[in-house]
């Protein structure tokens, strides 16, 4: 029993060191192997599809802003749902009910309609 435990510990250590060495080798290989050809396309900045040579004050649709804010709001509320099964003080049906009512309200008000 003691002998197999020592072998298991040795194999665990060996595999850990082997994984570390392989990862280090791949990291150094990725750093030294790529070609250093820089052209105008690779060295030019790219900002989410906007041309960086024009004005940075390009107006965009208020509808896009509204959908982005709604996404952040519902995303935050979904993130708050994760600890809900462990909650003792709050009944688990209240938060999904509030989320559903908010979603239905936005749907009825037309906040989720992209094209008018």
UniProtKB/Swiss-Prot annotation:
Topology in the lipid bilayer: Multi-pass membrane protein
EC number(s) per entry: 7.1.1.2
UniProt KW Translocase keyword: yes
Chief localisation class: mitochondrion
Residue intervals passing through the bilayer: 10-30, 64-84, 88-108
InterPro entries attached to this UniProt entry: NADH_UbQ/plastoQ_OxRdtase_su3 (IPR000440), NDAH_ubi_oxred_su3_sf (IPR038430)
One GO cellular component term: NADH dehydrogenase complex
Location of the protein in the cell: Mitochondrion membrane
Pfam families in UniProt: Oxidored_q4
Keyword Transmembrane helix assigned: yes
Catalytic reaction list: a ubiquinone + NADH + 5 H(+)(in) = a ubiquinol + NAD(+) + 4 H(+)(out)
MF annotations from Gene Ontology: NADH dehydrogenase (ubiquinone) activity
Keyword line: Electron transport, Membrane, Mitochondrion, NAD, Respiratory chain, Translocase, Transmembrane, Transmembrane helix, Transport, Ubiquinone
Described function: Core subunit of the mitochondrial membrane respiratory chain NADH dehydrogenase (Complex I) that is believed to belong to the minimal assembly required for catalysis. Complex I functions in the transfer of electrons from NADH to the respiratory chain. The immediate electron acceptor for the enzyme is believed to be ubiquinone.
Entry's family note: Belongs to the complex I subunit 3 family.
UniProt-recorded name of the protein: NADH-ubiquinone oxidoreductase chain 3
Organism field: Patiria pectinifera (Starfish)
